Amino acid sequence: MRVINFFLLISFLFIPHSFSNETSWNLLKDGGKVVFIRHAYAPGGGDPDNFDLEDCSTQRNLNQQGVRQSQTIGQLFIEYSIPVDSVYSSQWCRCRDTARYAFGDFKNFSALNSTFSGKYQKNHSKQMLELSEFINRWDDSGGNLVFVTHYVIVGGFLDYYPNSGEIVIADKSLSILGTIKVDF
């Protein structure tokens, strides 16, 4: 009996991750969820000292793996027939590119901008309030509300720190219902 239990335990450890994502994808099928997506893979951390919001060449950007990861996110939303009400993105190029490759249409939303660097840290509380008010006004009777943003924003808002391209599903009261990791 112990041998069987051991093999069952070992087998469980090697179940593909997508299997564990099924429950999370099913949560999204009826709409009405708030979906936070950390931007897809962009090597490094933070942004260079000469960072300029209007100039992508001064920012940390998606590489080819990040582009593929973004495209995979979009393909999975289609494959699972996930209804999307609106997609909003941070104004950082890596977030906008993630949104564009995954969903096509999106709107910029400054409340989703990173507050990681000293230059923007002072905006953190204001952005959290603006984002909270936006979600409270959102009519959750339709599709899902999608935010493409940064580690620091998801962490500050949900107290969960996602990997690159990870999808975090919450209800309107911002209780985390599930997460989906998308490989790059």
Where are these predicted regions, by residue range?
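Active-site-proximal alpha-helix that buttresses catalytic centers in soluble enzyme cores
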Residues: 21-110, 115-119, 160-184
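A polyampholytic, Gly/Pro-enriched intrinsically disordered region
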Residues: 126-138
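Bacterial Sec-dependent signal peptides at the C-terminal "C-region" and cleavage site
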Residues: 14-22
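Bacterial N-terminal signal peptides
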Residues: 5-14
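Active-site-adjacent alpha-helix immediately C-terminal to a catalytic or transition-state-stabilizing loop
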Residues: 16, 135-184
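Short, surface-exposed amphipathic charged segments that create phosphate/polyanion-binding patches used
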Residues: 121-128, 184
